[in-house]
């Protein structure tokens, strides 16, 4: 029987780190096709195409420099061509681009394709919250799983030990995806609460912006710990309000929950840029250009989408930390007033 074909949709920092793992595993495991395609948004790097550089030097020199990709990972600049014939699609692009990509892929996938989203973010639907995996699943008519965890891309690429969580409703699919992605240093737990796993991945970026504000304002470790805890409480409260399936507190103790929250609040780009925002007074857009090579920050954008949903439901007051991050990023509230928003938190009433 032919091995299952895998396509990675996306090739940024995290997409390239995952390509390293998937490419290596696919080349060694009999039930996967060794050739892994990776859709690359074509860019010009010093007069050469990025796809050409990846396919000859086996390195994403722009988004994951210094790390060799397996030679069986093939960069393809056309997303439809990359996904043609794929049995498994791994989605790992900034969440604001997913709608357009799904529109391009519609009608071009083979029957029985499955997808897994590594995208941290949420979307607004007509009835409020829309998870990215739902957007993809409904658009393409494929079953979707998610992978979220304490996974800073550069550390995963360096093969430093970490854990992650796959949310998958179908145990057989969950096992297949685990085989494709697990390594001795990238350990995977599979749970069935897909919605909760994905909500964790999106909301922790908002909390990390708050943690970055604390660092930029020099508030110290106790304050930052309080921000992280209050953020976790808001994440759980939000999940219980908005997830259609069951929400157990145990899922928040998996890598996708508390572990991802901790690593993002101490090491991630949302924290780093938010700290610079509090220190320098420069805009988020300017700091993205200066610090992230033009890549987009997920935290502020997710805060904006969330705020719109909470407003719609009349629940803004129940989520003061999420609301404070939104107001500082988009409504010109002074960052120095961030802590005032937490002094009357519902948790303390």
Curated annotation (Swiss-Prot):
Q: Which family does it belong to?
A: Belongs to the NAD-dependent glycerol-3-phosphate dehydrogenase family.
Name the UniProt record assigns to this protein: Glycerol-3-phosphate dehydrogenase [NAD(+)], cytoplasmic
Q: Where is the active site?
A: 204
Kind of enzyme, top EC level? oxidoreductase
Question: What is the native source organism of this protein?
Answer: Rattus norvegicus
- What is the first-listed, main subcellular location in coarse terms? cytoplasm
Recorded GO CC terms: cytosol
Q: What does this protein do?
A: Has glycerol-3-phosphate dehydrogenase activity.
Q: Which GO terms describe its biological process?
A: cellular response to cAMP; cellular response to tumor necrosis factor; gluconeogenesis; glycerol-3-phosphate catabolic process; glycerol-3-phosphate metabolic process; glycerol-3-phosphate shuttle; glycerolipid metabolic process; NADH metabolic process
Gene3D superfamilies named among the record's database cross-references: N-(1-d-carboxylethyl)-l-norvaline Dehydrogenase, domain 2, NAD(P)-binding Rossmann-like Domain
Q: Identify residues that carry Phosphotyrosine.
A: 326
Kindly state which keywords UniProt assigns to this record, in alphabetical order: Cytoplasm, NAD, Oxidoreductase, Phosphoprotein
The catalytic activity, as recorded, is: sn-glycerol 3-phosphate + NAD(+) = dihydroxyacetone phosphate + NADH + H(+)
Q: Which residues carry this modification: Phosphoserine?
A: 154
Tell me which Pfam families the record gives: NAD_Gly3P_dh_C, NAD_Gly3P_dh_N
């Amino acid at each position: 029987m032919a091995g299952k074909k895998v396509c990675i949709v996306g090739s940024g920092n995290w997409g390239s780190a995952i390509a390293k793992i998937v490419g290596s595993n696919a080349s060694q495991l009999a039930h996967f096709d060794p050739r892994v395609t990776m859709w690359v948004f074509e860019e010009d790097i010093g007069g050469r195409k990025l796809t050409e550089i990846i396919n000859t030097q086996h390195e994403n020199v722009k988004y994951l420099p210094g790390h060799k990709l397996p030679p069986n990972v093939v960069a393809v600049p056309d997303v439809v061509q990359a996904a043609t014939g794929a049995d498994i699609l791994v989605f790992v692009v900034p969440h604001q681009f997913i709608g357009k990509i799904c529109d391009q892929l519609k009608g071009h996938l083979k029957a029985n394709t499955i997808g897994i989203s590594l995208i941290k973010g949420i979307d607004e639907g007509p009835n409020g919250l829309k998870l990215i995996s739902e957007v993809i699943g409904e658009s393409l008519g494929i079953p979707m799983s998610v992978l979220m965890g304490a996974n800073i891309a550069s550390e995963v690429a360096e093969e430093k030990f970490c854990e992650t969580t796959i949310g998958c409703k179908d145990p057989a699919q969950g096992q297949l995806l685990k085989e494709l992605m697990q390594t001795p240093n990238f350990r995977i737990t599979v749970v069935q609460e897909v919605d909760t796993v994905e909500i964790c991945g999106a909301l922790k970026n908002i909390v990390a912006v708050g943690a970055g504000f604390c660092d930029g304002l020099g508030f110290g470790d106790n304050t930052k710990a309080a921000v992280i805890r209050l953020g976790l409480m808001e994440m759980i409260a939000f999940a219980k309000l908005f997830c259609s399936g069951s929400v157990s507190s145990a899922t928040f103790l998996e890598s996708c929950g508390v572990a991802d929250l901790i690593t993002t609040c101490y090491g991630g780009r949302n924290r780093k840029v938010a700290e610079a925002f509090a220190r320098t007074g420069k805009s988020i857009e300017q700091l993205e250009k200066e610090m992230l090579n033009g890549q987009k920050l997920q935290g502020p954008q997710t805060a904006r989408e969330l705020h719109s949903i909470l407003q719609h439901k009349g629940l803004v007051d129940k989520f003061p930390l999420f609301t404070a991050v939104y107001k500082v990023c988009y409504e010109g509230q002074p960052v120095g007033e961030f802590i005032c928003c937490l002094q009357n938190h519902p948790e303390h009433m």
